[in-house]
Amino acid sequence: LERTFYIIRHGQTDLNKQGIVQGRGVNSPLNAHGLKQAEAFYERYKEVPFDRVITSTLLRTHQTVEKFIASGIPWTQHAGLDEISWGVYEGKPQDEEIMSGFERLVKSWTDGMLDVCVDQGETPDEMKIRQESAMLDILELTKSDKLVLICTHGRAMRMLLCLLTEQSYAVMDSFPHTNTALYKVRYDGEKFTIDEFYNTEHLNGLNE
């Protein structure tokens, strides 16, 4: 039953670079630098005999692990791994008004108010329900697998790591992320243990 999940965030998109809010409702592709990050991750981990690749339904995660998929590893998309919905903020530049709104929102979350969200967006409580359901599906899907590559999104990854380590989503910011950063998480059939925390070694020497 033991298996290891390599959980990564997608590569850079132009909207990441421009500071535009993406979220679940924005389906932007990787930019040239994001494709380089994906290539660097592939070169570093292509010898790992992954049994399965699981991504969100959004293009940026598909492109990040495209070479693993192209090599013939079975691939599953799961909407439960999609980014949080940022509601009315999605697709908008992070100007002062949006940034201050973001800061207030994340402060509320880290203060334990997990039932608040951007107008028309998702709350951490709603994300937890979505991610719990996704992980039940994923554990069932991977029960005969040993090594699984998961590509998801920044905020979604932080929240998922809280879920897997049985911590409140209020501590989500204790899990740093950057594009293609890796968390290696082992499952022993009962609980999850983080074996590698925020590994970005594959990005060494990669300039924008």
Predicted regions and their residues:
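Phosphate-handling substructures
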Residues: 71-130
